[in-house]
Every structure is written in structure tokens, then in C-alpha cells.
Amino acid sequence: MLNKLSRLLADAGISLTDHQKTLLVAYVDMLHKWNKAYNLTSVRDPNEMLVRHILDSIVVAPYLQGQRFIDVGTGPGLPGIPLAIVLPDAHFTLLDSLGKRVRFLRQVQHELKLENITPVQSRVEAYPSEPPFDGVISRAFASLNDMVSWCHQLPGEKGRFYALKGHLPGDEIASLPDDFSVESVEKLRVPQLEGERHLVIIKSNKV
């Protein structure tokens, strides 16, 4: 699997250390193992996980600005854990309301010795915003409107929302509240992944 990951990374133009690659493969191994009992993802094949979970997460890394991020509705740690592995100087709070997912995240944290993640079991609306985050990240979590409404308290003054989407959600962009606007839309290239992928970056218009 390490060889396949190396080929995918080369195809995507992403350079990682051998240690980072080893951690990513170890995470996939754990996800595959725990998935049989905990049903953490509909993707069953570890090789498919490399594309649909690992590559699909880390292609976002170049667009993130700041040091403190929160991954809302992280599920089994996506995209937060792959991003934490490739961005070791940043910190990621991994938020999910389901206990079985958070137990898995804590086990990943322990086994992979990831010191830059904090798994938290909480609903996003109930999570405190102090200190504020540089970025709020979601992947298939909610509509853009719901994301900014439920998470409005989390980013700092210059913080951003980073929403990973499939096709460009024009209707969701059009229905954003007036307090928020789209700063940019980045088309993402994920080797061997069918369909479009976009990153929508949103900022607050409040002064």
C-alpha cells in the first residue's frame, strides 16, 4: 500500500517524508480494521481509501491559512487526521457527536503518536469558541448555509471556513447569508477519483 500511496502522491505533485507516508498508511490500516466493527465509512477497500479519503483530504493543505483548525463533523477523522499528518506544525481539533467515532480518533492519536490533534465529542453548536480558530473545515458535513450558521462562533476575526464539496454548489453559494461571502473556489485534482472536487473558502463580512 505504501508503494501505491507514493505513486498517487507523485501523480498529485505532493511531496511527503517517508515518516508521513508511513503514518498515512497506518491510519488507513486502522480505519480498515475498525470499520468492520464500527462502520465508520462506506469505503471498504483500503486501496480505495487511499484515493477517496487520504488524497481527497490532503490536496486541501496548500490552501489552509493559520495554525489552529477545527474539523467539524470529522467522522473517522476526515479530513483532519490526514491534514494533521502532512501539516505537523498546525493543530487540528476533531469534533464529532458520536462516541464510537471519537473512541477511534483517540486510538489513532495514541497509536500514531499524533500530538497535534484533539478529538472532542460534542455537537458543533455547543462547542465553545475560545480561543477562536484560524479555520473551520468540513467535508460532506452540511450545506454551506448550515455550516456558517452552526459554526459562526468558531473562527477568529480573520478566520475562514473551508468546505470540501463535490460539484460546484452554486445554489448553496447563492443562498449564503449576507454576513458571509465566498472568498474563492478552488478546483481540486485528486488522482484516480471520479467526479469533480471543489474547495469553497468563505469569510465573514462582519467588521
UniProtKB/Swiss-Prot annotation:
Q: What are this entry's molecular-function GO terms?
A: rRNA (guanine-N7-)-methyltransferase activity
TM region(s), chain numbering:
none
Alphabetic keyword roster:
Cytoplasm, Methyltransferase, rRNA processing, S-adenosyl-L-methionine, Transferase
- In which compartments does the protein localize? Cytoplasm
What superkingdom does the record give? Bacteria
A Pfam entry, by short name: GidB
Q: Which GO terms describe its cellular component?
A: cytosol
* CDD domains, per the entry: AdoMet_MTases
Q: What is its EC number?
A: 2.1.1.170
Q: Which reaction does it catalyse?
A: guanosine(527) in 16S rRNA + S-adenosyl-L-methionine = N(7)-methylguanosine(527) in 16S rRNA + S-adenosyl-L-homocysteine
Q: Where does this protein hold S-adenosyl-L-methionine?
A: G73, L78, V124, E125, R139
Q: What class of enzyme is it?
A: transferase
Q: What is its main location?
A: cytoplasm
Instruction: Give the protein family.
Output: Belongs to the methyltransferase superfamily. RNA methyltransferase RsmG family.
Its annotated function is as follows: Specifically methylates the N7 position of guanine in position 527 of 16S rRNA.
Query: What's the protein here called?
Result: Ribosomal RNA small subunit methyltransferase G
